[in-house]
Swiss-Prot record:
Ranges annotated as biased composition (Acidic residues): 624-634
UniProt name for this protein: Chaperone protein dnaK2
Cross-referenced InterPro entries: ATPase_NBD, Chaperone_DnaK, Heat_shock_70_CS, HSP70_C_sf, HSP70_peptide-bd_sf, Hsp_70_fam
Keywords: ATP-binding, Chaperone, Nucleotide-binding, Phosphoprotein, Stress response
Compositionally biased region (Low complexity): 601-623
UniProt GO MF annotations: ATP binding; ATP-dependent protein folding chaperone; unfolded protein binding
Induction notes from the record: By stress conditions e.g. heat shock.
Similarity comment: family membership: Belongs to the heat shock protein 70 family.
Function: Acts as a chaperone.
Gene3D superfamilies per record: 1.20.1270.10, 3.30.420.40, Actin, Chain A, domain 4, Substrate Binding Domain Of DNAk, Chain A, domain 1
HAMAP family, alphabetized: DnaK
Pfam family, one: HSP70
Amino acid sequence: MGKVVGIDLGTTNSCVAVMEGGKPVVIANAEGFRTTPSVVAYTKNQDQLVGQIAKRQAVMNTDNTFYSAKRFVGRRVDEVNEESKEVSYEVEKSGSNVRLKCPVLDKQFSPEEVSAQVLRKLAEDAGKYLGENVTQAVITVPAYFNDSQRQATKDAGKIAGLEVLRIINEPTAAALAYGLDKKSNERILVFDLGGGTFDVSVLEVGDGVFEVLSTSGDTHLGGDDFDKVIVDHLAATFKANEGIDLRQDKQALQRLTEAAEKAKIELSSATQSEINLPFITATSEGPKHLDLTLTRAKFEELASKLIDRCRVPVEQALKDAKLSSGELDEIVMVGGSSRMPAVQELVKRVTGKDPNQTVNPDEVVAVGAAIQGGVLAGEVKDILLLDVTPLSLGVETLGGVMTKMITRNTTVPTKKSETYSTAVDGQTNVEIHVLQGEREMASDNKSLGTFRLDGIPPAPRGVPQIEVTFDIDANGILSVNAKDKGSGKEQSISITGASTLSENEVEKMVKDAETNASADKEKRERIDIKNQAETLVYQAEKQLGELADKVDADSKAKVEDKRVKLKAAIEKDDFDAMKSLLEELQQELYTVGASVYQQAGAAAAESGADAGAAGAGDSSSGDDVIDAEFTESK
């Protein structure tokens, strides 16, 4: 079994880690950073960009730069009305599914495809670090992700060419990282406020056992929402002063969003932030600039409702765990947004404890995922992880009521069976509507899909006995089995609608991604060759200029000939010619370099011989010789 990496696939940033020598190690990306922006872009030349390079060009390429895709993964169009208004790219519908429009390619992407590109980059960068292909991963999801979102995350991994060995909840991963070396039992609350989601989990940790007691959260709350209140404030202030709504201009909106994120981060350590956006727009009177000071107090006032929304899941998680805040030993803060002083103050007020600051909120989830990967690969021993399902699962019964079969915070994996019957005489099939949520009425909960069991022998209503079994695996993903006890007929059922992508669509995307990866690799190689060629042409010019009087005419002519030919190949984009000429010019430069050193050596030898002859003539007696010790220079 090869190395299993742990990946924190975040809304804003992602991170990858691996177990090395029994310790989790965070892997820096190709650009040298330990986290990678979860951003994918396509340029006018149809080149794909992922990570920091994609984020940097977002202002100039708003329609084709995709970020915060995690907020759309596994969701229907009617579930993301607010989120779709907060991004600069166009969110479209395909049936009831979300699609992200890419004008430059004239196509639509599923959110899973965008997430897959981020996963692929992380896996490739990890592969370069490890010196081997990475094909297996543990990927984290918010604890409050429903079945559709978990399945969609697994699909994203598959599209990226990864075998997803386990989907693990982010707070649980953080607890794994925090509690790996803890011997004594501790009750901890993990407060995970990320870029797009918010989770709270209460766990009992100690001596290798990690038991989740409860989990709660809000998948519509995260750092993006805090950015938005700053964006709205900036836009409203500018409109009041200038009469122009910057939110109607995509480029201006993107600049506002980036400035808001920067200000939010600054206000975690400073009491005020200067926001300067020159040339934000223009009128017939000339360019307009935005210049504003945002204080921490004003930001906290703007975000007060969002901060208050963090309170309820904390209280709910404690209630479900049947614990008081006084029974907690530690509060572990996770996610970049947990750095906000107002958020930390809220946690302190609700729990009565100072948050634990010993873990890195941006990396701890990936570290925990790597530990779980180590457990699955057999590298890490004596770890027992007992997680829970975040939401109740059930079926719709007579009168549109949701009847729960598996209640929230049940330890997974788990299996539960219930027996149902027919509603009318002679009924030969039943349709079962599978739901996830906590509301009493079926229509108020998340529909995971419906299935039919046919071939039931006709009988009076209430007589047939149909046993329905819900089975949740260790990933928190549901499968359903139905059995007619009378006929013994049994059927395993895949719930249609549990994922926003069909199996065929996933397979097609896997093939497309593989094809694109090959094309991207070839494109990257061509760029590298061209860069090497341009560098060598420059070096040749510089070397000939500096060593002009030391290089014979014949050698100089050979270098110049190859240099001119290589420069012509660069201008024509002739990569085959570039490859061969690169080697030839390099060889000529080696020859020139060797010749120069030989000349220098010969001159030094001649000079030494002359000095020796002169010294011999001056020598008188050995009495003047001085003994000295020399140390070797290193």
